[in-house]
């Protein structure tokens, strides 16, 4: 296996909170997949949940070297946890097509958050 890309992102949680206060659920609808949306609606810390997902998706877009453009959207990157609680990444739509085109066979996600920040790193391998 070879590393195809590495991306890291850090999000200020208060900034996400401010956007939600101004625009309601619009940011969450734009960023979250349908599965994540269902979790977010009843999550005990929805702002923190959204900030962490946003960080992973930005890191993933950086790892793919594309950013969010040319048909890619945040909600095409879905963060979920495996049976041990480890964060994983599932792709949909154009993100999945891009991964197939690049020959991605594995994606690694690490995620951390503290009082003020959430950060994520994504590594993609061929």
From Swiss-Prot:
Q: Which residues bind Mg(2+)?
A: 9, 58
Q: Which reaction does it catalyse?
A: apo-[ACP] + CoA = holo-[ACP] + adenosine 3',5'-bisphosphate + H(+)
Write the record's keywords in alphabetical order, separated by commas. Cytoplasm, Fatty acid biosynthesis, Fatty acid metabolism, Lipid biosynthesis, Lipid metabolism, Magnesium, Metal-binding, Transferase
Q: Can you say where in the cell this protein is located?
A: Cytoplasm
Q: Does the keyword Magnesium apply?
A: yes
Chief localization: cytoplasm
Q: Which InterPro entries match?
A: 4-PPantetheinyl_Trfase_dom, 4-PPantetheinyl_Trfase_dom_sf, ACPS, Ppantetheine-prot_Trfase_dom
Q: Tell me its EC number(s), please.
A: 2.7.8.7
Source species, domain of life: Bacteria
Cofactor(s) listed: Mg(2+)
A GO CC annotation recorded here is: cytoplasm
Spell out the molecular function terms from Gene Ontology. holo-[acyl-carrier-protein] synthase activity; magnesium ion binding
Q: Which GO terms describe its biological process?
A: fatty acid biosynthetic process
Coiled coil regions in record: none
Tell me which HAMAP family the record gives.
AcpS (MF_00101)
Return the similarity comment.
Belongs to the P-Pant transferase superfamily. AcpS family.
Any idea what job this protein has?
A: Transfers the 4'-phosphopantetheine moiety from coenzyme A to a Ser of acyl-carrier-protein.
Q: What is this protein called?
A: Holo-[acyl-carrier-protein] synthase
Instruction: Please give the organism.
Output: Escherichia fergusonii (strain ATCC 35469 / DSM 13698 / CCUG 18766 / IAM 14443 / JCM 21226 / LMG 7866 / NBRC 102419 / NCTC 12128 / CDC 0568-73)
Read off the lineage from the record.
Bacteria, Pseudomonadati, Pseudomonadota, Gammaproteobacteria, Enterobacterales
């Amino acid at each position: 296996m070879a590393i195809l890309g590495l991306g890291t992102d850090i999000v200020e949680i208060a900034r996400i909170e401010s956007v939600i206060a101004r625009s309601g659920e619009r940011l969450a609808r734009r960023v979250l997949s349908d599965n994540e949306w269902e979790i977010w609606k009843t999550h005990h810390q929805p702002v923190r949940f959204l900030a962490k997902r946003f960080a992973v998706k930005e890191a993933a877009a950086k790892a793919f070297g594309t950013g969010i453009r040319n048909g890619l959207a945040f909600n095409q990157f879905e963060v979920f946890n495996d049976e041990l609680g480890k964060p994983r990444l599932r792709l949909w739509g154009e993100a999945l097509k891009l991964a197939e085109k690049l020959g991605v066979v594995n994606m690694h996600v690490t995620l951390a958050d503290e009082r003020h920040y959430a950060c994520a790193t994504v590594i993609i391998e061929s």
